[in-house]
């Protein structure tokens, strides 16, 4: 499921984001990209779509993944390397980016596992 989240950056199949995240008041996300506030489901989906649509030639690597299961709750932590071309469609320009970061995803299991919270942040070079 975590790979599905980041594969959207390659496939641009944004409906997959709705399939793997729970649409409820309990959903939340945080990141080091503005806005810095705690985001709800609809805000997170909109920002994820904007981010992934703005990066062409997207690729990622998940390293040092640790998964812990506590009944119907799962916690996944890992280091994340992302790269691609950040595209400005209005100015017809692009900039190569490489982001080294870390991530925590909290999952809950109802009928199937879904993301209920995630936190992404960059590691300073």
Give names to the regions the model predicted.
Residues 72-84, 88:
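A short hydrophobic beta-strand element
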Residues 54-55, 83-96:
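Short, cysteine-centered beta-strand-loop-beta hairpins and adjacent loop/turn segments enriched
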Residues 48, 62-67, 82, 101-111:
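Hydrophobic/aromatic beta-strand elements that line small-molecule binding cavities or substrate pockets
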């Amino acid at each position: 499921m975590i790979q599905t989240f980041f594969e959207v950056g390659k496939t641009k199949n944004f409906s997959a984001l709705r399939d793997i995240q729970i649409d409820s008041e309990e959903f939340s996300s945080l990141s080091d990209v503005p806005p810095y506030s705690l985001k709800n489901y609809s805000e997170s989906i909109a920002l994820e779509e904007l981010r992934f649509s703005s990066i062409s030639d997207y690729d990622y690597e998940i390293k040092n993944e640790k998964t812990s299961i506590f009944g119907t709750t799962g916690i996944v932590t890992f280091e994340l390397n992302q790269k691609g071309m950040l595209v400005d469609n209005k100015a017809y320009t692009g900039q190569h980016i490489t982001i080294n970061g870390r991530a925590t995803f909290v999952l809950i299991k109802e009928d199937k596992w879904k993301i209920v919270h995630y936190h992404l942040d960059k590691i300073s070079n």
